[in-house]
Amino acid sequence: MIIYISGKVTGTTDYKERFAAVEKRLKVDGHRVINPIKVCRHIQPGSPWVTYMRTCIRALTRADAIYLMRGWRKSPGARLEQQIAVALDMVIMAQEKGD
């Protein structure tokens, strides 16, 4: 299964590590993973939020499922990605407290 990782980035400093840890765990479980941090690494730092989101949404549409990291509801981008995933009838996975 191809899984897109979704979570809070803006306003955090540890997002690269958090997304990398989730990516590693999902790959160990045998999944192909779309990590938006890697997908957006070509974007010039300081670019508008919408520039990142357009790239992320294109990547999301290539996935079969979305993995919602803890705290995703605090992120406007992650909430938008979740709404798109629901509209596209994707599998919705959510990080548990112990994950």
Language model segments and positions:
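Conserved catalytic or regulatory cores that recognize and/or transform ribose-phosphate-containing ligands
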Residues: 1-99
